[in-house]
């Protein structure tokens, strides 16, 4: 493990026991202590680069104060343009930010855009209440516009400051105002989330030592046979998953220990978004709680869901919620594959400027189009047994597609990514294009069958009338 990874691990490990202490604090003390601890972590790991995140926060606050109506669009433009400056600071003679500063900046970008949307919703709903004299039906809406102190406290809250998960300002405010945090579940769900982390960590270390990523860039790698080169991406994606499984499960445990994102099960919370329905518990029955709001990874479904599009739902779930609510609806396209492509383009930009991100993320819409074509033209014609076989083949190809795309994500450079993909003959791209072509061909045949069947039925009807 690199020194940076050890620092991440140390911060993650420390936040879990610290979280339990926060349950004993009153709301004002909890807010101040969480801010202080977050600032200590930020300054200790980022130093002077903490100013980047502070500029982002202050800029968003100014936008909200000046024009809350247009704040969502303006904050998105501001934070994403600042990301560009942040990544090109060396062009202006400024020092390169640390990886820790980059992690904080990424999560802060999501928080600021979400905050602007929440404030806009608050003002719009308040106007409706005044004009209609009725209570707003919005679930989990703000009760007041956050002050500058509130915004800074939310931005630098120590929980998930570098590792996520993303959570809305309302989730943060609900955490501060919990009436009896000591009575909420903590130890058991925390241990439940941590129980597989040692396994993930050991698998990460073991497989990474046998299949190092750096070997892919060597000339010796290309001397191996095709099947070895193909299998290597399977191992690399396995290492990638184990790394993030362990990190995100640990980050979720840090939220759970502090009680952040704890809501009654009846609230039907969504990862990242929080409650989706208003919930009034029955005073005569025990209330059961969950931490769905801060769930960032579903390890089982990531591995065993069938479709490429479903795989995205279970990976980095809170960020997927953010993309689905703030980017996907505003895409300048109507077709699902094109809207997904737009969303993936924005996601790639959020991750960074390396070409490998774009090559990987923009392969996803192609795979989605391929699986959609095959489902409509092939799976729909099969019986239950045939569909079961189809789904297993689909799952296998889904995993290989993510293996393939992961290589661009970790190799980063366009030359390295294309060099590897060419060494396995761009197999996933070719399979996807073939699937789309087969789907279109069979779709055309199905239309001809329907047309011929319809013409035959018309001829039979005419013949019956003549007789």
From Swiss-Prot:
GO biological process terms on file: lipid modification; phosphatidylcholine acyl-chain remodeling; phosphatidylinositol acyl-chain remodeling; phosphatidylinositol biosynthetic process; regulation of triglyceride metabolic process
Protein name: Membrane-bound acylglycerophosphatidylinositol O-acyltransferase mboat7
Gene that this sequence comes from: mboat7
Coiled-coil parts of chain: none
Recorded topology in the membrane: Multi-pass membrane protein
Function: Acyltransferase which catalyzes the transfer of an acyl group from an acyl-CoA to a lysophosphatidylinositol (1-acylglycerophosphatidylinositol or LPI) leading to the production of a phosphatidylinositol (1,2-diacyl-sn-glycero-3-phosphoinositol or PI) and participates in the reacylation step of the phospholipid remodeling pathway also known as the Lands cycle. Prefers arachidonoyl-CoA as the acyl donor, thus contributing to the regulation of free levels arachidonic acid in cell.
Species this protein is from: Danio rerio (Zebrafish)
Glycosylation site list: 316
Transmembrane segments: 6-22, 34-57, 74-93, 194-211, 231-260, 422-442
InterPro entries documented for this protein: LPLAT_7/PORCN-like, MBOAT_fam
Keyword terms: Acyltransferase, Endoplasmic reticulum, Glycoprotein, Lipid biosynthesis, Lipid metabolism, Membrane, Phospholipid biosynthesis, Phospholipid metabolism, Transferase, Transmembrane, Transmembrane helix
Lumenal topological domain: 23-33, 94-193, 261-421
Pfam family, one: MBOAT
Record region (Disordered): 447-467
EC number: 2.3.1.-
Classification of source organism: Eukaryota, Metazoa, Chordata, Craniata, Vertebrata
Subcellular location: Endoplasmic reticulum membrane
Topological domains annotated Cytoplasmic: 1-5, 58-73, 212-230, 443-467
Catalytic reactions on record: a 1-acyl-sn-glycero-3-phospho-(1D-myo-inositol) + (5Z,8Z,11Z,14Z)-eicosatetraenoyl-CoA = a 1-acyl-2-(5Z,8Z,11Z,14Z-eicosatetraenoyl)-sn-glycero-3-phospho-(1D-myo-inositol) + CoA; (5Z,8Z,11Z,14Z)-eicosatetraenoyl-CoA + 1-hexadecanoyl-sn-glycero-3-phosphocholine = 1-hexadecanoyl-2-(5Z,8Z,11Z,14Z-eicosatetraenoyl)-sn-glycero-3-phosphocholine + CoA; a 1-acyl-sn-glycero-3-phospho-(1D-myo-inositol) + an acyl-CoA = a 1,2-diacyl-sn-glycero-3-phospho-(1D-myo-inositol) + CoA; 1-octadecanoyl-sn-glycero-3-phospho-(1D-myo-inositol) + (5Z,8Z,11Z,14Z)-eicosatetraenoyl-CoA = 1-octadecanoyl-2-(5Z,8Z,11Z,14Z-eicosatetraenoyl)-sn-glycero-3-phospho-(1D-myo-inositol) + CoA
Compositional bias ranges of the Basic and acidic residues kind: 451-467
